[in-house]
Amino acid sequence: MTATLPTTPTADARIAELRGQIDQCDAEIIALVHRRLAVSQEIGELRRATGGTRLSLAREKQVLARFSAALGGDGAALGMLLLRQGRGRL
C-alpha cells in the first residue's frame, strides 16, 4: 500500500482546475460522438435507400486502422465502440 501525501490548497486548486479541463474535454468528446452518430446514421440510410448494404467492412477496417495507429490497442477498441454506436451490433 502506498502512502498518500497531504495536499495543499495550491495543489487542490490546480487539481480542481485540471478536472474542469477534463470535464470540458469530455463535453466536447460527447458532442463529437453525437455528431458522428448522426452522420453515420445518414450514411446508413442513404446506403439502404440506394440498395446498398448496411455497412462497409472495408470502411470499418480503415476506421479501426486509423484509431489503432493513433491510439494503440485501446484506440482500436474505442473505434469499434464508435462503429457499433453508429451501426448497431452485428
List PLM regions with ranges:
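Domain-level signature for soluble enzymes in the chorismate/prephenate branch of the shikimate pathway
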Residues: 1-90
